[in-house]
Amino acid sequence: MAKKKATFICQECGYQSPKYLGRCPNCSAWSSFVEEVEVKEVKNARVSLAGEKSRPVKLKDVDNISYHRTQTDMSEFNRVLGGGVVPGSLILIGGDPGIGKSTLLLQVSTQLANKGTVLYVSGEESAEQIKLRSERLGDIDNEFYLYAETNMQAIRTEIENIKPDFLIIDSIQTIMSPDITGVQGSVSQVREVTAELMQLAKTNNIATFIVGHVTKEGTLAGPRMLEHMVDTVLYFEGERHHTFRILRAVKNRFGSTNEIGIFEMQSGGLVEVLNPSQVFLEERLDGATGSAVVVTMEGSRPILAEVQSLVTPTVFGNARRTTTGLDFNRVSLIMAVLEKRCGLLLQNQDAYLKSAGGVKLDEPAIDLAVAVAIASSYKEKPTSPQEAFLGEIGLTGEIRRVTRIEQRINEAAKLGFTKVYAPKNALQGIDIPQGIEVVGVTTVGQVLNAVFS
């Protein structure tokens, strides 16, 4: 007879305790513990839908044909996955409510239906509701199946009947296994349902997409084990009041985690943005103070983005600092360098900084653009609309080299920029395209003197 053991599990982080706790000692969440009964039982060996048991094989004998990636019609989506969908992969997609996760997967699944059988399982919407949303996306292939169900046993039965090539679960928090105690979305339910989906995906080469809810802190809800079990973790980011969405990989066993895909939400669904640099800069005002352009790298893709700054005298006892899309600590460091090394009196100035377009900038190469934007607003002097800035700022005010400098300069030249300020030590041996001047600089003070003299 199976032994039953009661444990209390934190719904936020998955921490387990033998007794109820008002506050989680791991994540400090209040009233997050729920009681769950753990049933220990011996399960049979895992088999595929064809009834074949898995057995050890030599690495050199593994068939590489099964690794063939399936391309979707969205090049941005393929880029983030590393070149396409790998058979048997388990892909988790998280994002804020209403950001467009279901819309993205519905578009992707309709495209995959042209290359295989798709089973779309929804625990949040009825089949009629999904059909209503899908009508704006265009024609749907006959190999696209909808299934509104939350019972894992029933879902497994239909998987065995249909034998899909692609499976979409929307969402994992709504699916429950009747063999496991706990409500839908509980730690034990999410863990066991994900384990069963992983077994189905790996033994039958079913590419599986899972939608995951996020907490108010922006992390994926449920046990941390969920992210360890899957092959790929994607975050769909963006502000609900902006039309742009960014798909970012934070874990990918079949590709790079540095790639991003950029989409725009329109009435007909998500449309990929193939030239994000032009989109992010098209509304920039000529002659405005507090603005500077940087060429940032998102994976292997260079993107031109605008850094905006507003520096005003404070009316409070302490100066206020606010950032959106930029790292607060990095901005504070740059302001300290400007005050110490360049003589800008910023201790009594409020500073508000943001990256235009909602894109997040977090690499060291943006330092020089941030410094120039702050100085431009402080001095009330605009920068030239044809100038871009590259470089990391050290604590002594020096400009340090950044990666892929040649690729960044080429992107700036392609969009019509005529001058780029870049670290002098990084310019040796690179080919500079015609029509653009690259100014090698060594200190941030040298840049400010050249730009605002």
Swiss-Prot record:
Its EC number is 3.6.4.-. GO terms for cellular component: cytosol. InterPro entries: AAA+_ATPase, DNA_repair_RadA, P-loop_NTPase, RecA_ATP-bd, Ribosomal_Su5_D2-typ_SF, Ribsml_uS5_D2-typ_fold_subgr, Rubredoxin_2. Residues 350-453 are annotated as: Lon-protease-like. Gene3D superfamilies: 3.30.230.10, P-loop containing nucleotide triphosphate hydrolases. One of its GO terms (molecular function) is ATP-dependent DNA damage sensor activity. A zinc finger (C4-type) spans 10-27. GO terms for biological process: recombinational repair. The keyword Zinc-finger applies. A motif (RadA KNRFG motif) lies at residues 251-255. Keywords: ATP-binding, DNA damage, DNA repair, DNA-binding, Hydrolase, Metal-binding, Nucleotide-binding, Stress response, Zinc, Zinc-finger. ATP binds at G95, D96, P97, G98, I99, G100, K101, S102. DNA-dependent ATPase involved in processing of recombination intermediates, plays a role in repairing DNA breaks. Stimulates the branch migration of RecA-mediated strand transfer reactions, allowing the 3' invading strand to extend heteroduplex DNA faster. Binds ssDNA in the presence of ADP but not other nucleotides, has ATPase activity that is stimulated by ssDNA and various branched DNA structures, but inhibited by SSB. Does not have RecA's homology-searching function. Has a putative N-terminal zinc-finger, a middle region with homology to RecA with ATPase motifs including the RadA KNRFG motif, while the C-terminus is homologous to Lon protease. Belongs to the RecA family. RadA subfamily. This is DNA repair protein RadA.
